Amino acid sequence: MSFTTISVIGLGYIGLPTAAAFASRQKQVIGVDINQHAVDTINRGEIHIVEPALGNVVKMAVEGGFLRATTTPVEADAYLIAVPTPFKGDHDPDMAYVEAAAKSIAPVLKKGALVILESTSPVGATEQMAGWLAGMRPDLTFPQQAGEQADVNIAYCPERVLPGQVMVELIKNDRVIGGMTPVCSARASALYKIFLEGECVVTNSRTAEMCKLTENSFRDVNIAFANELSLICAEQGINVWELIRLANRHPRVNILQPGPGVGGHCIAVDPWFIVAQNPQQARLIRTAREVNDGKPHWVVDQVKAAVADCLAATDKRASEVKIACFGLAFKPNIDDLRESPAMGIAQSIARWHSGETLVVEPNIRQLPKKLDGLCTLAKLDAALAAADVLVMLVDHDEFKAIPGDAVHQRYVVDTKGVWR
């Protein structure tokens, strides 16, 4: 069965680019999202997120009649579910969005349909999703019931793209295809090959789920090593960025760069899925998460020390000291604030500090709710002119272009080594 109509459930940072990629190949694409604002924005040919090159692709797809958005699922040949999978307070995965998405498409499923889960998920999630679908559609057969002869094919195919480069990497990167059966994998591969230039690498759904978690846990462990080095170097009076530069001259050493912590919807979340299912075995992965989650507290302590130094060297009162935090996103040059350590740091500073806390984030127009009323969103030049203490949290290009003399004779906490 060919794929004439494709539906993408969840039109966020992954779902919308995926929908746009299919639509750019002149496939009929129906995007589904519960956010009415996002739906209306897309149907105007505009985008509600920041991602280079995405806006033009969406505009052309909508104008060409290949992409439309709605809040209610409709019948399609293939469904791709790209909804959030956060963790709960106890770090157990929260599959509520996936369950809701699956149950929303169940009434419109037809024989021959393909359902792909893209959301980062714990091992076994694809089989669980298939169970939800089967429970709502006893008139259809699914892979866990009928194997290769199932009416509906199901696969797990995780994304592996870098925010800020999504429209390139979505097409160029290899794709892991984890079907519940070989037929499921073959059909999922055929779907992605509509736009994919990379290779479709086939496995089973459980291995594909674990592969995504493994990739991000590997990165988290390596970042934790760099972050722990930064704590040690601060204690020993050593420039950690110089140290890493020198150590990386060893032909078999490649240490990553430290920062204020780890954020985003993948690296800061996915390792907990492994830990939750394997608490006795995943000791290193848990420790890495704890190291990275602890880094923001250390940064706040450095800011408190900088304010104390400022007070000791001037005649200002604490309420007269202005602190400027540079960056809120979880990585450079994007507007995505999910799980951002910079957000938590800015919030902690503003709650502790009796003076004004300025925030500079060039990729947003208004502060998120958790900072509204605590901080002041400021322009770059205004913050540089007004602040006594400068806190570098995200190395956006605009910040890296700041000349050294602009921060001269200020109290600086630089978590990214931009002003070293």
Swiss-Prot record:
It holds the Pfam family UDPG_MGDP_dh. GO terms for biological process: enterobacterial common antigen biosynthetic process. Its EC number is 1.1.1.336. UDP-N-acetyl-alpha-D-mannosaminouronate binds at R160, V161, K212, N216, R219, H250, R252, G263, F330, K331, K416. It catalyses: UDP-N-acetyl-alpha-D-mannosamine + 2 NAD(+) + H2O = UDP-N-acetyl-alpha-D-mannosaminouronate + 2 NADH + 3 H(+). Keywords: NAD, Oxidoreductase. NAD(+) binds at Y13, I14, D33, T85, T126, R338. Disulfide bonds: none annotated. The keyword Ribonucleoprotein does not apply. GO terms for molecular function: NAD binding; oxidoreductase activity, acting on the CH-CH group of donors, NAD or NADP as acceptor; UDP-N-acetyl-D-mannosamine dehydrogenase activity. Catalyzes the four-electron oxidation of UDP-N-acetyl-D-mannosamine (UDP-ManNAc), reducing NAD(+) and releasing UDP-N-acetylmannosaminuronic acid (UDP-ManNAcA). PANTHER family: UDP-N-ACETYL-D-MANNOSAMINE DEHYDROGENASE. Homodimer. This is UDP-N-acetyl-D-mannosamine dehydrogenase. It comes from Salmonella typhi.
